[in-house]
């Protein structure tokens, strides 16, 4: 029975184990001088119903048939077939005609990836026939996980759809059957914007393999039952247009910037007239975004030094630099002083009401619903980079979006530690100002008597 994904708001990409279908690089030009990348430099169409192409290197054992094209099957433990292009494009347009693989724990993917681990992705979970995930990475940086998104894509396992990536120096556009589902601008992505020569990879792997980390297995929808396979993804055709020209692309320095890339016998952006998607003024809303939690490895990142696979799901994020409990005010009330013996001395006039710190924290956690997607907000103390500091008081709160999907998997409540107190803790916070006021009044009275 096909199961919907619980908590698809976990985006994509990364980890440190498992199958050969993951991303790696033979030579990282950010670390050393590497050979030039062979350029596509033109527009090409591949019809895989006619068989394989010498322009693609097979890994594993993809097969071909006249109806569906290239077939990538997981039939037993360790299977992770894919094809990868022998050429690179320096900005460009790719259209994949794909029918994704069903099956709990099975992951289908179509990826653009560079030698320095820039990456643009489509990924489908076999446990979910309703959604597709998109993601991007710059220089293999998996230090934050606010880049993934999920989009409506009902029936992706039942028939072929056209999935497009249009990539320029200013934006990335993801489309399904000609309809734009996401736009990323270079300005908004900053240093994480993919901007170096990319190869194409298409394939399938078992995220639910029992040897994988528990977190990876649960993200993939559960443990893969190989006896119920094989699980097959199909790539009927692929159209690719390189927006640059030449024979090869070379990194002239170790910056990874697109302006540092040179073309042998051509020009970067020399084929920009072939751009098929003009600037998109506004992007449609995505089905779900991932702002706050790390995500499990999804079959396209293997060797990234900054990531360690979590062993459980849901993950617990590290505490922020500010405490999520009530801030402590260590200063004395206005007019109060310490005597030479370090005794508290009230002002000579009427008693002063001490400032009592309070903070209202509200937690509304997302949970699965048979009515579909539910999104909840969690008020949390932000990290120091997003807070306005003030003595003894919390300045603001940050809102994280957690999305869940209708599922027949065992229900759970998404949880984030160091975000919001329990009900009892919240009551304690509300009672704190009253208790502090009573304490200060008693203290002032005792000092006045003695």
Curated annotation (Swiss-Prot):
Q: Can you quote a single GO CC term?
A: incipient cellular bud site
Q: Which residues are glycosylated?
A: 383
The Gene Ontology biological process annotation of the record reads:
carbohydrate metabolic process; chitin metabolic process; fungal-type cell wall organization
What SUPFAM superfamilies is this protein classified in?
Concanavalin A-like lectins/glucanases
Question: Is the Coiled coil keyword given for this protein?
Answer: no
Assigned keywords, A-Z: Cell membrane, Cell wall, Cell wall biogenesis/degradation, Disulfide bond, Glycoprotein, Glycosidase, Glycosyltransferase, GPI-anchor, Hydrolase, Lipoprotein, Membrane, Secreted, Signal, Transferase
| Reported consequences of knocking out the gene | Does not affect growth rate, germination or sporulation and displays only minor sensitivity to high concentrations of Congo Red, even when all crh family members are deleted.
Q: Which cysteines are joined by disulfide bonds?
A: 27-34
The record places the active site at 119 (nucleophile), 123 (proton donor)
Compartments, as annotated in UniProt: Cell membrane; Secreted, Cell wall
Keyword Glycosyltransferase recorded: yes
What EC number is given for this enzyme?
A: 3.2.1.14, 2.4.-.-
Could you say which residues form the signal peptide? 1-21
Q: Where would I find the GH16 domain in this sequence?
A: 46-228
Membrane topology, from the record: Lipid-anchor; GPI-anchor
Coarse class of the primary localization is: membrane
Where chitin binds, per the record, is at 123, 201, 205, 216
Pfam families named among the record's database cross-references = Glyco_hydro_16
InterPro entries on file? ConA-like_dom_sf, GH16, Glyco_hydro_16_CRH1_prd, Glycosyl_Hydrlase_16
Chemical reaction(s) catalysed:
Random endo-hydrolysis of N-acetyl-beta-D-glucosaminide (1->4)-beta-linkages in chitin and chitodextrins
Entry's Gene Ontology molecular function annotations = glycosyltransferase activity; hydrolase activity, hydrolyzing O-glycosyl compounds
Of which family is this protein a member? Belongs to the glycosyl hydrolase 16 family. CRH1 subfamily.
Function of the molecule: Dual chitinase/transglycosylase that plays a role in cell wall architecture. Chitinase and transglycosylase activities are coupled. Required for the polysaccharide cross-linking at the septa and the cell wall. More specifically, transfers chitin to 1,6-beta-glucan in the cell wall.
| Name of the protein this chain belongs to | Crh-like protein 4
| Taxonomic placement | Eukaryota, Fungi, Dikarya, Ascomycota, Pezizomycotina
Q: Which gene encodes it?
A: crh4
